[in-house]
Amino acid sequence: MVSGVKVSDECVYEFNKLKIKHIHKYIIYRIENYEEVIVDFLEQDNSLKSYKDIIIDIRNNLKTTECRYIIADMPIPTPEGVLRNRIYFIFWSPDLAKSKEKMLYASSKEYLVRKINGIFKSLEITCDLEDFEDELRTIILNT
């Protein structure tokens, strides 16, 4: 906890529901009052079947000037064409976010990742919101 930011119990609880019960497609976390990581948004929409649908939905729930952490459970096609669910941790640090906020999120990220267990890959996205979908899709398909 280098930054002094705590992780709420709800963050871990909701992550476990995503990982074990597959109740959520993704979770968006935010840092509240520079003190604690909390759940900002939970997505349970069963109509989001593909990783493309999930990425678009995530993008629609982000803001151009605010950092966020996202955990997404996405069905990714293997080279053999089989879908495998993978849990990604995404640190969203948009170009237009304030420097102080970027530093706080960057210094708190590892503590959150250590509190949860079962992440396939940890990613950092720093592009503009309009490029988020393409950037994330490219990274995911190349992992």
Swiss-Prot record:
Main location: cytoplasm
Subcellular location: Cytoplasm; Cytoplasm, Cytoskeleton
ADF-H domain ranges (all copies): 4-141
Keywords: Actin-binding, Cytoplasm, Cytoskeleton
GO biological process: actin cytoskeleton organization; actin filament depolymerization; actin polymerization or depolymerization; cytoplasmic actin-based contraction involved in cell motility
The keyword Electron transport belongs to this UniProt entry's keyword annotation: no
First and last residue of the signal peptide: none
UniProt cross-references to InterPro entries, sorted A to Z: ADF-H (IPR002108), ADF-H/Gelsolin-like_dom_sf (IPR029006), ADF/Cofilin (IPR017904)
Self-association state and partner proteins as the record states: Interacts with monomeric actin, does not bind to actin polymers.
Family: Belongs to the actin-binding proteins ADF family.
Protein name: Cofilin/actin-depolymerizing factor homolog 2
Species of origin: Plasmodium falciparum (isolate 3D7)
